[in-house]
Amino acid sequence: MEGEDVQALVIDNGSGMCKAGFAGDDAPRAVFPSIVGRPRHTGVMVGMGQKDSYVGDEAQSKRGILTLKYPIEHGIVTNWDDMEKIWHHTFYNELRVAPEEHPVLLTEAPLNPKANREKMTQIMFETFNTPAMYVAIQAVLSLYASGRTTGIVMDSGDGVSHTVPIYEGYALPHAILRLDLAGRDLTDYLMKILTERGYSFTTTAEREIVRDIKEKLAYVALDFEQEMQTAASSSALEKSYELPDGQVITIGNERFRCPEALFQPSFLGMESAGIHETTYNSIMKCDVDIRKDLYGNVVLSGGTTMFPGIADRMQKELTALAPSTMKIKIIAPPERKYSVWIGGSILASLSTFQQMWISKEEYDESGPSIVHRKCF
């Protein structure tokens, strides 16, 4: 498999969005929702050339008549038939390439079950006939994208958050922590607190509206209690949002109450530690000699770290937990929404990486378990 003349494909399958494109590019060509929609009612649209399923943006735009499903939950693929549909859509409709002509780099969640990486490998070689493939851990790619090989990545997407300490390019599995609290939970929480104000959002279609409100208006307060007092005493923090039907709603303290759940999961009725404490706990599980390097390289990654104010708050909270003399640095690259994909694009275009691919020949010889030997 000579990777010189053929461009590799990089696909980052997130719980909420799929990011896909070509190795060597500086941004993904295609970014679309990781959803598969099926009609709720059969045959209401006569002559529409009805399909039995829709993927991505098309599913999103027809959401009023569809039931939407996410095949990736908490970062891990749970529905392989739908996942195959998403990959098919990625190759043929979004990138318009023949998968049998390009090596494919896929990403996976930290601590992804072994059976899952095998299944991914099997589908790529057997269903799509790719000449070569590789599976890389998402957080490691984010760190590469920030130009580092050592640091701790706090990756928070739509379905799951992880803190992943990485030393000299290797993730330290014993210190990786997973937090099942991410963008989708924050959207649900915002739906709940808006409902308390008398606005009703219930369907899967309305959830997408609330997600948009969250992405456009929410922010992280540096001091939550103080922000609550400010919000109570003045309307300075209020913003208005126009719904698709023209109704205008006003949103006040919900703007920062929503992402506050990242730091106080008890808001969602969860007993776990917040993202700051989880980051600290991850660092404490590492060898004492490398902690200084981790504290000095805390890299934020994923769409749920895009809230304004999150880096300052993280700095404040970690400083309170860490030894008083410790230098703490939070790195929040502006492109962090796509840093996993960007890291994959960098990795797959390195000349030194070309011997790392799992080739079709190796797969035919060893079967799906080859992935554990070659992808670390």
From Swiss-Prot:
Gene3D superfamilies: 3.30.420.40, Actin, Chain A, domain 4 (3.90.640.10). The modification Phosphothreonine is found at residues 202-204. The modification Tele-methylhistidine is found at residue 74. It comes from the Eukaryota. Pfam families: Actin (PF00022). GO terms for biological process: phagocytosis. The modification Blocked amino end (Glu) is found at residue 2. InterPro entries: Actin (IPR004000), Actin/actin-like_CS (IPR020902), Actin_CS (IPR004001), ATPase_NBD (IPR043129). The record marks 85 as: Not N6-methylated. Its EC number is 3.6.4.-. The keyword Membrane does not apply. One of its GO terms (cellular component) is actin cytoskeleton. GO terms for molecular function: ATP binding; hydrolase activity. It is an enzyme of class 3 (hydrolase). Keywords: ATP-binding, Cytoplasm, Cytoskeleton, Hydrolase, Methylation, Nucleotide-binding, Phosphoprotein. PROSITE patterns: ACTINS_1, ACTINS_2, ACTINS_ACT_LIKE. This is Actin, plasmodial isoform.
